[in-house]
Design a protein with these regions (language model features):
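Aromatic "clamp/platform" in nucleotide-sugar-dependent glycosyltransferases that forms part
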Residues: 251
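Short alpha-helical donor nucleotide-sugar binding micro-motif in glycosyltransferases
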Residues: 130, 231, 238-243, 324
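Donor nucleotide-sugar binding/catalytic pocket of nucleotide-sugar-dependent glycosyltransferases
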Residues: 124-170
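A charged, aromatic-enriched C-terminal amphipathic alpha-helix characteristic of glycosyltransferases
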Residues: 302-339
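Conserved donor-binding/catalytic core segment of Leloir-type glycosyltransferases
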Residues: 174-207
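Short hydrophobic beta-strand element within catalytic cores of glycosyltransferases
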Residues: 264, 268-271
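Nucleotide-sugar donor phosphate/pyrophosphate-binding loop at the beta->alpha transition
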Residues: 98-100, 109-128
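Nucleotide-activated donor-binding/catalytic signature segment of Leloir-type glycosyltransferases, i.e.
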Residues: 216-235
Length: 340
């Protein structure tokens, strides 16, 4: 089977969507599934206003339709709700082709953080976008419950995976900062709510890994925080394992891949009780969640690091691929036996 992934998020972006697509595509090979991608990289692009790191494709519905037809794929999966996703959806509906979608990003909250756009308007549009397909993949039960309450239908379970061979506790070393070390990894952007972490009165050191549009501003505002910028994957694994607690201040993520990377490294996680953290560590195993983020961060210092590692072991890319293919097969009305 050949599947076309249509995504407005792609390299050189470094984010959870791109990482998930890369790992899912690689894992699907063992299911005898070949994936192709339609991304902004083959078009002229325009930076997204207020977020220049994201490039939007400048093209037409007719060209997108021709490109999809030329790929001769068995199924179209729409990953994002940007220009390419919108045009691919239009093509599928006009051609009478079944398609599936993913709900990766809480765009209504992202938009309202930057522009005076009511969240209700954005959710209404997203509901119509996703409900017109044959299935929408969501990574957590709490997200599914929230979207269902907003009128989304055809929601299908998904998950995320983590490379537990790469992210592991034995990579722990001395980072050279006073302990305990509180770490945060991710895009340095307004929707990630980093000041909620950086404003906390915590002992030891705060360390932030990642790039983004807010980096210069936050560096100036928080001179005592260690901002390390982007780090290669090998070095990132060492940093994860060397922290004493991982703090996840975002309230708008739909999962939080960095959470399970930290857990796989044996580092307990502190977060708000919101979608993603509540699903992964809401039972107190592997971390702590609280509306008082400082309380959660301090509590995480006392969480068993072996338990954190064990919690990460339940997340695999094979399970993610199996859930993905089940949704695709439902959309196509097939019951193919997947390769082992």
């Amino acid at each position: 089977m050949r599947i076309l992934m249509v995504t407005d998020a792609w390299r050189p972006q470094v984010n959870g969507v791109v990482h998930t697509l890369e790992r899912l595509s690689e894992t699907l090979k063992s299911f005898d599934v070949e994936t192709d991608f339609l991304t902004p990289n083959i078009f002229r692009t325009l930076p997204l206003p207020t977020y220049p790191d994201i490039m939007l494709a400048l093209t037409t519905p007719h060209r997108v339709a021709r490109l999809i037809e030329a790929r001769k794929v068995d199924h179209v999966h729409i990953v994002t709700e940007g220009p390419l996703g919108i045009m691919a959806r239009r093509y599928c509906r006009n051609a009478g082709r079944p398609f599936t979608t993913s709900y990766h990003t809480r765009f209504p909250e992202y938009l309202s953080a930057r522009l005076p756009v009511p969240e209700a308007w954005a959710y209404r549009w997203l509901r119509d976008f996703h409900n017109s397909g044959q299935g929408t993949l969501v990574a957590t039960q709490s997200l599914a419950d929230d979207l269902a309450a907003r009128g989304f239908t055809k929601l299908r379970p998904s998950t995320r995976g983590v490379d537990t061979d790469h992210f592991r506790p034995d990579k722990r070393k001395d980072l050279g900062f006073p302990g305990p070390i509180f770490l945060c990894v991710g895009r340095v952007a307004i929707e990630k709510n980093l000041p909620a972490f950086l404003d906390l009165d915590l002992p030891g050191s705060k360390v932030v890994v990642g790039e983004g549009p807010e980096l210069a501003k936050l560096k100036a505002r928080y001179p005592d925080t260690h901002f390390l910028g982007h780090r290669p994957n090998d070095e990132l694994a060492e940093i994860y394992a060397s922290a004493d607690a991982f703090v996840f201040p975002s309230r708008t993520d739909t999962f939080g891949n960095v959470i399970i990377e930290a857990l796989a490294s044996g580092t307990p996680v502190a977060a708000y009780p919101v979608t993603g953290p509540i699903d992964i560590i809401g039972d107190g195993i592997g971390g702590a969640v609280s509306d008082d983020l400082r309380q959660a961060a301090l509590a995480a210092l006392h969480v068993d690091r072996a338990e954190a590692r064990q919690r990460a072991m339940r997340y695999s890319w094979k399970a993610c691929a199996e859930m993905f293919m089940k949704t695709v097969e439902e959309a196509l009305g097939t019951t193919r036996k997947l390769a082992a």
